[in-house]
């Protein structure tokens, strides 16, 4: 079914494009909002992503729907990062010895809260923390790949992830303690 849809898009079938868009817009929107939480900006990024997907689809080597979905998620993530870089919203905090370290906590206990609550907590992180945690945890990038993609050092990527996890662990702990 999906393979036939891709073939029809390659032949510039407008109905196939519309059907494809409807089939994947929700999934790709959620990827987009992880990086760009502002609705108007996210809509722009998503639109640019679909343009890129539709123009690149003729050369995409379709092997499976899973591979297609992974590729589209990477396109959206790349477009979101490009958008943030162009607008200088992607700020990273270099951690130094002078930075007051957060209390060392275990890994965030994400299983204690709902996925929606976790998503909300991640969206409230600073852009740098949020971007690195999304790329590392949800997209599976290594610190080297993140560093290359964002133009930062591997240690900055690792530091951003460390502090993002500490903040999330603290917030989860506060939330679960307040419910007792």
Map each language-model feature to its residues.
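N-terminal module of bacterial RNA polymerase sigma factors
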Residues: 1-27, 58, 123, 144-145, ...
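Internal acidic/polar
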Residues: 2, 82, 89-118
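Sigma70-family region 2
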Residues: 10-11, 50-65, 87-88
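Short, charged helix-capping/linker segments at alpha-helix termini
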Residues: 10-19, 30-48, 154, 176-180
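Short helix-capping/turn signature of helix-turn-helix
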Residues: 22-26, 34-35, 134-141
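Structural recognition of an alpha-helix C-terminal capping motif at a helix-to-coil junction
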Residues: 44-51, 66-78
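Arg/Lys-rich amphipathic alpha helix in sigma70-family domain 2
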Residues: 59, 73-94, 163
């Amino acid at each position: 079914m999906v393979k036939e849809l891709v073939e029809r898009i390659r032949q510039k079938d407008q109905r196939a494009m519309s059907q494809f868009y409807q089939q994947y817009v929700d999934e790709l929107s959620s990827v987009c909002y992880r990086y760009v939480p502002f609705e108007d900006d996210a809509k722009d990024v998503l639109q640019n992503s679909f343009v890129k997907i539709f123009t690149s689809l003729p050369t995409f080597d379709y092997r499976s729907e899973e591979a297609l979905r992974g590729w589209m998620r990477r396109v959206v993530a790349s477009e979101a990062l490009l958008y943030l870089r162009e607008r200088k919203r992607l700020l990273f905090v270099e951690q130094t010895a002078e930075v007051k370290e957060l209390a060392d906590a275990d890994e965030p206990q994400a299983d204690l809260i709902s996925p929606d609550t976790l998503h909300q907590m991640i969206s409230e992180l600073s852009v740098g923390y949020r971007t690195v945690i999304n790329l590392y945890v949800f997209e599976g990038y290594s610190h080297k790949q993140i560093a290359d993609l964002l133009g930062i050092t591997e240690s900055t990527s690792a530091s951003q992830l460390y502090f993002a996890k500490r903040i999330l662990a603290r917030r989860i702990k506060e939330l679960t303690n307040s419910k007792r």
